[in-house]
A protein has these predicted regions:
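Conserved helicase NTPase motor core
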Residues: 2-14, 18-23, 111-112, 164-262, ...
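ATP-hydrolysis module of ASCE/P-loop NTPase motor domains
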Residues: 78, 96-173, 178-184, 408-416
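ATPase/helicase motor core of nucleic-acid motors
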Residues: 266, 334-466
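C-terminal accessory regions
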Residues: 516, 530, 558-679
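Conserved RecA-like helicase ATPase core segment
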Residues: 226-316
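Conserved helicase core region in the C-terminal RecA-like lobe
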Residues: 79-89, 213-217, 242, 344, ...
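P-loop NTPase Walker
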Residues: 1-98, 288-291, 598
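Accessory C-terminal helicase-associated subdomains
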Residues: 394-395, 399, 433-543, 547-549, ...
Length: 679
């Protein structure tokens, strides 16, 4: 970022007292602005200890602390905390005063927490096997987080009509989870927030020394965090909230866009509203596209995101191709950081296989490869092993054998009876276990299961290592072993994600024509990747929030899955995957697309399916929402890529005045804002 502040930044830095709301677009230099503001407050006589700065996560808190220390050139700096760490401090005070019961803090990284969650899950879902699908545990944890964010107790969840269509298993498991915490005198960070708010309500002197409170990423706060901020604010406190309603993408875990979209101004009288509408991250073409998409939401767009002259001339490309490996092979990506982002985990699994096929390095943003934990991968791998070798010899001593066998058993459609699944998994995990005898003994007297096992036997050793993997997949489909994928899922979204995973892998195998042995090696024994370029970072769009890369590839841009359902959708699994999302869900998904494309600095690649309608939209330079259901996601239509490229070129070529009549009213608005900013 340039050292000179824009006039928008200067007005925030010089704000004196009183409540303020700062609406900041992606990459607008808000951290620099807030550091300068705090620096000014301290230099004009404000006691640093009377300033509280609340950051959304630990990494942001650490980064801001270092920058503020450098700016103030002092070890005495304001209190900079996450909501969780402040809550922990307040809870510690409550324990010392013997107002609340003393408990141990348990964090997600603690092995006891993992055991506790699994124990609660087994209770709620009557789950017998020792191994539990990590994706199912993640869904359960998200449900817990959503309940905690709104201070919903198990009794509330069981009796509140708004929870009537939630799967009962989740509520039973949640109840057991809360009991286990209490029985073991444990509390989580989410519990700390709830208890801290209760303490603040009962003791108004807590936090009374804070005269300035700054809250970053306010669009991501939930009800408990919002209440905490209000209770810390006294009559002489100035609260400044900073955020962007267009980046509120965590509603499914308790965030509320209305806190920044209107409630803040209602709760804090005489709030002064500031804008940070100038981005330092990407060029005009991408700014125009981001504005074009997000204006379709019901939240009134009063200021556009406008690119600063110092930003790179970001290049946007569209690829009409379902084969990611072809796109990766043809990309002339310049040097720099690079990421592949997706709405769903299924597409990340597809991307991982494509990257392995191309010999390109990669790593997941959060954690290691999850390919082996996907149940559709389990049944495909076992299906190919049986089709080629007739047994599971290649899985012997493989580190991921249990996860792969679990996936196979989960998706094979055996209609497990009580106790069978656990016995089958244990039997197949034994050294040199024979699948046919292990399952055959288990299915004695169960005709459907015996018939199912017999159908599986018909594919044995029908193919060789050189047989195209797509042919083996076709055989599995013909025998009915792919139809059941996703049918045992705990959540509707999880089930749909697994089904889409099969579709993505079908597309990759069909286009690449790799043989069965190559497919098995890609999954079980991937080769060494190239070392002459930065690894691709794989992340969901939700996980990419707050980050940026030089080059970004967006995949999974199909209308059928984006807009999709909530990531932690815990409603009935049998609901049709084609149920159209509600308008408010579409708006959250549109914000998610907006967040995704604005992670880019230099080059954005959008991988879309073949769609004649989109081709027509681009040819005519349209940017409207299609009335008929499209093939590619509606958000790519709304982005109006060709129209934005046309206007962007005019700006960079200094031909705006000559071509003014060719620009839409919306793009003329952008040009006026660009001129008005005088950046």
């Amino acid at each position: 970022m340039t050292k000179r502040l824009t006039w928008e930044q200067k007005s925030i830095v010089s704000h004196d007292t009183g409540h303020a709301l700062v609406k900041a677009v992606p990459g607008s230099g808000k951290t620099t602005t807030l550091v300068k503001r705090v620096e000014r407050l301290v230099k004009t006589g404000t006691d640093p200890r009377s300033i509280l700065i609340l950051m959304y996560n630990k990494s942001a808190q650490v980064s801001f602390t270092e920058k503020l220390k450098t700016a103030l050139m002092s070890s005495v700096i304001p209190e900079i905390r996450t909501f969780h760490s402040l809550a922990l401090k307040i809870v510690g005070y409550g324990e010392r005063q013997q107002i609340i019961k003393k408990k141990d803090l348990i964090t997600p990284s603690d092995y006891r927490y993992e055991q506790l969650v699994k124990q609660a899950y087994r209770y709620g879902f009557d789950h017998e096997a020792n191994y539990i699908d990590p994706n199912e545990i993640e869904n359960f944890e998200l449900f817990i987080a959503r309940c905690r964010a709104a201070a919903v107790t198990p009794v509330d969840a069981a009796n509140d009509p708004t929870f009537s269509n939630i799967k009962r298993e989740f509520i039973h498991a949640y109840g057991r989870y809360c009991e286990l915490l209490e029985e073991n005198s444990l509390r989580t960070f989410d519990d700390c927030l709830i208890e801290a708010v209760a303490l603040l309500r009962n003791d108004s002197s807590l936090g009374a020394h804070f005269k300035h409170i700054i809250v970053d990423e306010y669009q991501d706060v939930n009800l408990i965090q919002h209440d905490m901020t209000r209770l810390l604010s006294k009559s002489d406190t100035s609260v400044m909230a900073v955020g962007d309603v267009n980046q509120c993408i965590y509603e499914w875990r308790g965030a509320r866009p209305d806190f920044i979209g209107g409630l803040f101004e209602r709760h804090y009288p005489n709030t002064k509203v500031f804008q940070l509408s100038c981005t330092f991250r990407f060029g005009h073409e991408l700014s125009l596209m981001a504005n074009s998409v997000i204006r379709r939401n019901s939240t009134k767009l009063t200021k556009l995101c406008v690119s600063h002259p110092s930003t790179p001339k970001t290049e946007v490309r569209l690829h009409f191709d379902n084969c990611l490996s072809k796109v990766l092979s043809n990309l002339s990506v310049s040097s720099g950081t690079q990421a592949i982002l997706s709405r769903t985990k299924a597409n990340l699994a597809w991307a991982e296989i494509a990257l392995r096929l191309c010999g390109l390095p990669y790593r997941y943003l959060n954690g290691s490869s999850a390919l082996h934990t996907r149940t559709e991968i389990g049944i495909l791998v076992v299906g190919v092993l049986l089709s080629v070798y007739g047994d599971l010899r290649l899985l012997e001593n493989h580190p991921n054998k249990q996860a792969i066998v679990y996936g196979f058993l989960k998706e094979a459609g055996f209609r497990w009876q009580k106790g069978q699944f656990k016995a089958a998994l244990s039997g197949l995990m034994a050294p040199h276990a024979d699948l046919w005898s292990a399952l055959g003994q288990l299915f004695e007297g169960a005709q459907y299961q015996k018939d199912r096992l017999g159908r599986l036997a018909t594919i044995c050793q029908k193919d060789g290592e050189e047989t195209p993997a797509i042919d083996v997949l076709r055989r599995l489909i013909m025998e009915g072993f792919i139809d059941s994928v996703g049918s045992e899922g705990v959540t509707r979204t999880g089930s749909n994600d697994q089904q889409r995973g099969v579709v993505r892998i079908w597309e990759l195998l069909d286009s690449s024509k790799i043989d069965s042995r190559t497919f098995l090696n890609l999954i079980l024994n991937p080769g060494e990747a190239a070392t002459d370029c930065d690894p691709f970072i794989l992340s969901t769009l939700h996980g990419s929030k707050g980050l940026e890369w030089d080059n970004v590839i967006l995949i999974g841009l199909n209308e059928q899955e984006f807009p999709g359902g909530k990531p932690d959708d815990v409603y009935s699994v049998r609901t049709s995957m084609n149920t159209p999302p509600a308008e408010e869900e579409i708006e959250e998904e549109r914000r998610l697309f907006y967040v995704g494309i604005t992670r880019t600095k230099q080059q954005l690649n959008l991988v879309v399916p073949l769609d004649e309608g989109l081709a027509r939209w681009l040819k005519n330079r349209w940017d409207s929402t299609p009335k008929k259901s499209p093939i590619a996601t509606r958000f790519v239509y709304e982005a109006g890529w060709t129209a934005c490229a046309f206007t962007s070129d005019a700006i960079y070529n200094s031909t705006v005045e000559k071509q003014k009549a060719d620009f839409s009213k919306f793009h003329q608005w952008y040009l006026r804002d660009l001129q008005r900013l005088k950046v």
